[in-house]
């Protein structure tokens, strides 16, 4: 069998750089190397691109992915062809956060006409920006919790008015979030005004725009979506926390969360969640993969929280685990995503770019 040429891209100029490397290690150790010839590109914290070709061995130490002994190359040359001299059948970006999950690198792949795994420019950018995403959900009629949003420059000029707006529109606890980050980076749970001001200061270290959301006593439930024009969903899974707030540290360092798959919910609630996940997928014109996150209250009210266009993708993350529960292994999920990338690229070829 002739191997397909795949390039995995990871790292990136983002606060989620280390998460991306962990994801790359997991994917590289699970991808079917009998089917694929795999090259890797590492984007350093400084934005340099480094390439290593024909990865065949298990990645035992994550530090080996830093490519400290390799010189940086020119981006378009690195992406032009694989180690066997042929064009790539697909690029697999494993990038989280700004400069990777926000439509920027997807735009590069589009300009270079490269097939790539995951969401396109519009879906990636709108899913990354929490305010835009919420506005699209609102247009689609999906129920959400109350929120407000403002810019750093607005807060610097009108701090008192904004603090009053939070008091008038929301009740404590509230969650302060950078508008354009994932993995719970820069997010704070605030129970009073002092914590609110500290949380705003923390969030503005990571973004010029933030969102403050109403807190709620509810279960956190997630649904995985996979596909292009005709996506499929999983049964929901639940995040079980040993901490008050599911932050970056508890997600990736402390091991203080576990996953309940499938979630213990009435079947009617589960089906509603799956249907809402499909609506959210369509609302932002997604393709490839999405994880839709919800709140479910004790009386089974459902509120959509967000969609994640590049969800956590380590072997123990919720998204692959949900598909594992549906009978799709981690390795086969990787293969399916590559096939979806090629399918979307073939569909793009049907478009005309000239006028007769």
Swiss-Prot record:
PROSITE patterns: ATP_GRASP, DALA_DALA_LIGASE_1, DALA_DALA_LIGASE_2
Gene Ontology terms, MF aspect: ATP binding; D-alanine-D-alanine ligase activity; metal ion binding
Keyword Protein biosynthesis included in the entry's annotation: no
Record key words, sorted: ATP-binding, Cell shape, Cell wall biogenesis/degradation, Cytoplasm, Ligase, Magnesium, Manganese, Metal-binding, Nucleotide-binding, Peptidoglycan synthesis
Positions bound to Mg(2+) 1: 293, 306
Chain residues that bind Mg(2+) 2: 306, 308
Subcellular location: Cytoplasm
Family matches, as SUPFAM superfamilies: Glutathione synthetase ATP-binding domain-like, PreATP-grasp domain
Signal peptide boundaries: none
Cofactor: Mg(2+); Mn(2+)
Positions that bind ATP: 167-222
Name of this chain's protein: D-alanine--D-alanine ligase
Native species: Staphylococcus haemolyticus (strain JCSC1435)
Lineage: Bacteria, Bacillati, Bacillota, Bacilli, Bacillales
């Amino acid at each position: 069998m002739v191997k397909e040429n795949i390039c995995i891209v990871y790292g990136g100029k983002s606060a989620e750089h280390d998460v991306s490397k962990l994801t790359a290690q997991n994917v590289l150790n699970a991808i079917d190397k009998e089917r694929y010839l795999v090259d890797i590109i590492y984007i350093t914290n400084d934005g340099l691109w480094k390439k290593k070709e024909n990865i065949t061995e298990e990645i035992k130490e994550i530090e080996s992915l830093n490519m400290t002994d390799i010189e940086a190359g020119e981006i378009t040359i690195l992406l032009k062809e694989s180690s066997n001299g042929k064009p790539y059948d697909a690029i697999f970006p494993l990038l989280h956060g700004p400069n990777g999950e926000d439509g920027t690198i997807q735009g590069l792949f589009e300009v270079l006409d490269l097939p790539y795994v995951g969401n396109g420019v519009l879906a990636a950018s709108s899913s990354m920006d929490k305010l835009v995403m919420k506005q699209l959900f609102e247009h689609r009629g999906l129920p959400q919790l109350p929120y407000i949003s403002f810019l750093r420059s607005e807060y610097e000029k009108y701090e008192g008015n904004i603090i009053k707006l939070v008091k008038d529109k929301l009740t404590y606890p509230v969650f302060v979030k950078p508008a354009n980050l994932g993995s719970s980076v820069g997010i704070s749970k605030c129970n009073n005004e002092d914590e609110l001001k500290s949380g705003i200061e923390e969030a503005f270290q990571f973004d010029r725009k933030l969102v403050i959301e109403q807190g709620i006593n509810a279960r956190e439930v997630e649904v995985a979506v996979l596909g292009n024009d005709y996506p499929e969903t999983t049964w929901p899974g639940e995040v079980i926390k040993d901490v008050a707030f599911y932050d970056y540290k508890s997600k990736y360092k402390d091991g203080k969360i576990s996953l309940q798959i499938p979630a213990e919910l009435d079947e009617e609630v589960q089906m509603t969640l799956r249907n809402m996940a499909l609506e959210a997928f369509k609302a932002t014109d997604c393709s490839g993969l999405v994880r839709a996150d919800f709140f479910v209250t004790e009386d089974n009210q459902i509120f959509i929280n967000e969609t994640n266009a590049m969800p956590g993708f380590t072997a123990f993350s919720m998204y692959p685990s949900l598909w594992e529960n549906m009978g799709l292994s981690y390795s086969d999920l990787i293969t399916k995503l590559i096939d979806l990338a090629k399918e979307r690229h073939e569909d793009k070829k049907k478009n005309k770019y000239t006028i007769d």
